[in-house]
Curated annotation (Swiss-Prot):
The protein's name: Probable cytosolic iron-sulfur protein assembly protein 1
Gene behind the chain: CIA1
WD repeats: 10-49, 56-108, 135-175, 182-221, 228-275, 299-338, 346-380
GO terms for cellular component: cytosolic [4Fe-4S] assembly targeting complex; nucleus
Keywords, alphabetical: Cytoplasm, Nucleus, Repeat, WD repeat
Organism the protein comes from: Candida dubliniensis (strain CD36 / ATCC MYA-646 / CBS 7987 / NCPF 3949 / NRRL Y-17841) (Yeast)
Biological processes per GO annotation: iron-sulfur cluster assembly
Amino acid sequence: MVELLHSIKAHNDKAWSVSVHPTLPIIATASTDKSTKLYKLSTKQKFPLVAELEDTHKRSIRSVAFKPPLGGVDAPKLDFLDLPALAAGSFDSTISVWGIDEPDVEYDIDEVVANQKEILTSPNNEWNLMAIIEGHENEVKAVDWNFQGQYLASCSRDKTVWIWETDPETLEEFECVAVLNDHSQDVKNVSWHPSMNILASSSYDDTIRIYQQDIAGDEWSCVGILNGHEGTVWCSKFESFKSPTADSSILRLVSASDDLSVRIWVAKREEEEDKPELPSSIKHTKEMVWEVESVLPAVHKYPVYSVAWSSLTGKIASAGSDGKIVVYSEAEKGKWVIDSVHEGSHGVHEINCVIWAQLDDENEILVSAGDDGYVNLWNV
């Protein structure tokens, strides 16, 4: 059962995207109104506004993404303050990077680290613009950080995927280390694997592309093409190895499309040693062969814009143009069933994004963003 927990009137225009910080109870939103807003996921505090980031982009902000903690979510706890940071991609073709400055005053580091969920989500923190990244020729459609915060991926209507490298501790400079031109049309979404340096991109050309570095760590290239959708692929997300349904020997990915379907793909690897005829430029890259494992039960009547895969339960949520939020669970390997369907989740408006999140009490919820400018929080 999907039940409304809370509704936030976040924006005066379309809410495009929501990002959840991997370790802090905080979300960021993106909107046509050119602003990004941050809210704390606290029922006791009634989901307060933490920060409003504006007056930077000239056009719609299409995507936001929080940088993961240093070393990744599963890294040992740090004995210093790991300050949160956020990237925002805009239709003005640029990406902004925001962060909190470390306090100038002296403080007890042990106390701050122990209470960072409260301290780092306080509305008293000042979020500052740290960088503006330029390179794309047209609208930036999506941004996403890799699991260690070293790489930021972006995609655009210019048909390209860019990978930017930075020092995750300082975020002082962003160097473009790859421009990937494999798609023939507008690229709608990019998404990193939760614990591997593998990137997926989804496109108006009806395909999903998978990218990885060569073994030497020098070049990024396309190592897999997922064909099967009969319309624009709006979104794709990898399954986390933390998921109770995950198999660590394979990779799985869920995708959402204009063709009304939600699909699960599974990867099988081929070693390049078996392909001596390949050019030397990709000789040391592992090719991934992907197959459709299953097509989830048909529910949506209009294009599906967003999917999310829970690392806690293994459940998948989808949402899109028909205003439905659908939750699926895996009854047995490769066999999915519908858990619940919620109609009119944003009234008569389309849903642009759905994502799993944890409240400050660690209960898992769904968060959706719609054309009505609302961000809705759902108990599942």
